[in-house]
């Protein structure tokens, strides 16, 4: 079993990289790959860079060259559910682009022509993430829709527009739908797990960088817990 884990920023992969044993590193087209073992599981860790193009390029290289059995995308996101606070977790059941609009030609808002309107995460991986989250004390976890776009959501008008398009939305960020789209096209199971670094449309006296550190720590904890669950299930 080989796991692939993708994070966009150094803060989102640093904890996992530091835990990796037998680590080897290679940079391909600006994408930083680390291979080795995470808590006994063969793994490849990718720091892709921020945004959908970087995420899609990195995921394509990852799947083509390293052939993992599944993909976990980890990192931070902006929360949309009123019940969640900074540091809480969101696990994807579906992922969608929030900045794609080809509705003039009859497609659903967010749908790339020729592809599904939404990308469904692998049910077994979602369940493993859910079980792993339940083992982390003091954190809430929601399972639901995550939306992706190439912008940081700090414009209240944009927040309300996206909320209107996807009323059930749990979180927004900048890579997940691109990763999901590539995984779907390769036929590779995936799940997106994000810890909230901010709440869309809300202001805070604490800096984004401080929240990001908390979110990255919680997201990494969930990845490690999830690998333990997946490994246990594989041995049954």
UniProtKB/Swiss-Prot annotation:
It holds the Pfam family PNP_UDP_1. This is 5'-methylthioadenosine/S-adenosylhomocysteine nucleosidase. SUPFAM superfamilies: Purine and uridine phosphorylases (SSF53167). Substrate binds at residues 78, 153, 174-175. The keyword Cytoplasm does not apply. Belongs to the PNP/UDP phosphorylase family. MtnN subfamily. Keywords: Amino-acid biosynthesis, Hydrolase, Methionine biosynthesis. GO terms for cellular component: cytosol. GO terms for biological process: L-methionine salvage from methylthioadenosine; L-methionine salvage from S-adenosylmethionine; nucleoside catabolic process. The gene is mtnN. Its EC number is 3.2.2.9. One of its GO terms (molecular function) is methylthioadenosine nucleosidase activity.
């Amino acid at each position: 079993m080989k796991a692939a884990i993708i994070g966009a920023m150094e803060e989102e992969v640093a904890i996992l990289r530091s835990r990796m044993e037998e680590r080897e590193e290679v940079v391909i087209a600006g994408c930083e790959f680390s291979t080795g073992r995470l808590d006994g599981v063969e793994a490849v860790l990718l720091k892709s860079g921020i945004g959908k193009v970087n995420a899609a390029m990195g995921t394509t290289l990852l799947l083509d060259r390293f052939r993992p059995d599944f993909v976990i995308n980890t990192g931070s996101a902006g929360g949309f559910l009123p019940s969640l606070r900074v540091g809480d977790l969101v696990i994807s059941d579906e992922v969608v682009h929030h900045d794609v609009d080809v509705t003039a030609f009859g497609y659903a808002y967010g749908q790339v022509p020729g592809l599904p309107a939404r990308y469904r995460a692998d049910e077994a991986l979602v369940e493993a993430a859910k079980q792993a989250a339940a083992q982390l004390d003091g954190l809430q976890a929601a399972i639901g829709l995550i939306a992706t776009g190439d912008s940081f959501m700090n414009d209240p008008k944009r927040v309300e527009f996206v909320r209107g398009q996807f009323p059930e939305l749990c979180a927004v960020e900048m890579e997940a739908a691109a990763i999901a789209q590539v995984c779907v096209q390769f036929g590779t199971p995936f799940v997106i797990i994000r810890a909230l670094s901010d709440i869309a449309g809300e202001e805070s006296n604490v800096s984004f960088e401080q929240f990001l550190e908390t979110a990255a720590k919680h997201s990494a904890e969930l990845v490690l817990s999830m690998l333990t669950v997946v490994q246990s299930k594989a041995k049954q």
